[in-house]
């Protein structure tokens, strides 16, 4: 029995007809107790106890006042409680893993935020319309907002594993969506403060001289030169925290429930049809002790070691895989970096740019001012685009390479040897096998092979 489960994508967006029939001939002969016993509590982290229950409500500070971009960045870092954020962003300049492009972008949350328009005129108008700066967020911004999906419990029966994986994914996506709704309002508050600071900067540069039209012209010039760059800096910190914090919370809660029920996952066939899904921050199953397939081939231990190295750096629980782990070898190995490949920071930036261009894509307009190309932006149909990196604009490694905006294929999972999939001869039932003495000599070789999936 196999099921195609859409992870971070609608099934209709991708047609995956590949089978999950892979030959790990020793899977059904494994000593389950022996395998699970090797995964001891030494791998547990203090994070597990921190995230053992849902995070409590945490309201954002009042909207920031007009102040310098540096001060706004520092305030945001403190408000999020994310002192390691800047160091993480810097480190991701030297990583190649695509940890973000399989995560949903939630474009619909940004289609009505005019402050994110790629038109300078629209941004300026939205900034002036936002005066005075509000003293509170309405509705309130909860930095620990939760979704409506219930937390999934590890099933007692293997037949329910596929439903469990679906439920784990739905829970994560529900938490992420709920949290991002609040983070988008937080970003808007910082954009307002930044715009008002830039307006004051334009006035100071004119030193009180000039007409209102001269001030407006100067303000638009300052917005064009600085607003997009500074907004992108704030957004990178904000959304990195969103993705990391939600994934940590959900992953460690899943880890706590799965670590004491590992034996059931030996029966699971798990396939990542694209490498970016294996490198993604979120994994619904953390103890993949059954068959594990990456891009049509059995997952190799060195791939597991490399992704676990990154997960450890990000404070995420490691991925365990009993069939491929090698005795006396570490579970982590530092990945090599290539400057010729896209970087992790580029994949994050692509996610952010897609969000921040949503308003202009939904409300197209033609800017009145010529737009210069900046090192932090990319011209798209004459519009100024939000910050990026050179790596994010690189040509793909090959014509067949998976790109961040490509549809995300469904995750493929299957269950090995359940009551429904066990190939029994027509004259046998599970009840008769339990109550009667089974004479294997009366069963043909082909039927025996089918029974034991050989």
Swiss-Prot record:
It comes from the Viruses. GO terms for cellular component: host cell nucleus; viral tegument. It holds the Pfam family Alpha_TIF. It is found in: Virion tegument; Host nucleus. InterPro entries: Alpha_TIF, Alpha_TIF_sf. GO terms for molecular function: DNA binding. SMART domains: Alpha_TIF. The keyword Transcription applies. Keywords: DNA-binding, Host nucleus, Host-virus interaction, Phosphoprotein, Transcription, Transcription regulation, Virion, Virion tegument. This is Tegument protein VP16 homolog. It comes from Equine herpesvirus 4 (strain 1942) (EHV-4). The gene is 12.
């Amino acid at each position: 029995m196999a099921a195609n489960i859409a992870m971070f994508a609608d099934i209709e967006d991708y047609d995956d007809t590949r089978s999950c029939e892979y030959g790990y001939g020793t899977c059904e002969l494994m000593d389950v107790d022996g395998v699970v016993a090797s995964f001891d509590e030494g791998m547990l982290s203090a994070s597990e106890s921190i995230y053992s229950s849902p995070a409590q409500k945490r309201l954002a500070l009042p909207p920031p006042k007009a102040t310098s971009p540096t001060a706004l960045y520092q305030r945001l870092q403190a408000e999020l409680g994310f002192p390691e954020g800047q160091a993480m962003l810097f480190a991701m300049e030297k990583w190649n893993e695509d940890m973000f492009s399989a995560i949903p972008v939630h474009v619909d949350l940004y289609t009505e935020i005019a402050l994110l328009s790629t038109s300078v005129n629209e941004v300026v108008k939205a900034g002036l319309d936002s005066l005075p700066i509000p003293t509170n967020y309405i509705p309130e911004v909860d930095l620990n907002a939760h979704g409506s999906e219930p937390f999934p419990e590890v099933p007692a029966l293997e037949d329910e594993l596929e439903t469990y994986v679906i439920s784990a994914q739905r829970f994560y996506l529900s938490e992420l969506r709920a949290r991002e709704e609040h983070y988008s309002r937080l970003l808007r508050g910082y954009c307002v403060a930044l715009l008002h600071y830039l307006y004051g900067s334009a006035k100071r540069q004119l030193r009180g001289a000039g007409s209102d039209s001269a001030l407006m012209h100067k303000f638009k010039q300052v917005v064009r030169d600085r607003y997009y760059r500074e907004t992108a800096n704030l957004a990178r910190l904000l959304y990195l925290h969103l993705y990391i914090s939600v994934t940590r919370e959900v992953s460690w809660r899943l880890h706590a429930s799965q670590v004491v029920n590992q034996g059931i996952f030996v029966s699971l066939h798990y396939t990542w049809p694209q490498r970016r899904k294996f490198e993604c921050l979120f994994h619904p199953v953390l103890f993949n002790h059954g068959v594990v397939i990456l891009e049509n081939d059995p997952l190799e231990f060195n791939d597991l070691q490399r992704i676990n190295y990154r997960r450890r750096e990000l404070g995420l629980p490691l991925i365990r895989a009993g069939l491929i782990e090698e005795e006396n070898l570490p579970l982590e190995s530092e990945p090599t970096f290539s400057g010729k490949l896209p970087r992790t920071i580029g994949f994050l930036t692509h996610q952010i740019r897609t969000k921040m261009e949503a308003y202009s894509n939904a409300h197209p307009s033609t800017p009145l001012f010529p737009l210069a190309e900046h090192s932090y932006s990319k011209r798209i149909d004459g519009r100024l685009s939000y910050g990026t990196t050179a790596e994010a604009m690189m040509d793909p490694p090959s014509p067949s390479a998976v790109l961040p905006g490509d549809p995300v294929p469904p995750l493929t999972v299957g269950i090995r040897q359940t009551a429904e999939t066990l190939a029994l001869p027509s004259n046998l039932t599970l009840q008769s096998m339990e109550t009667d003495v089974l004479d294997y000599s009366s069963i043909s070789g082909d039927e025996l092979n089918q029974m034991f999936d050989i």
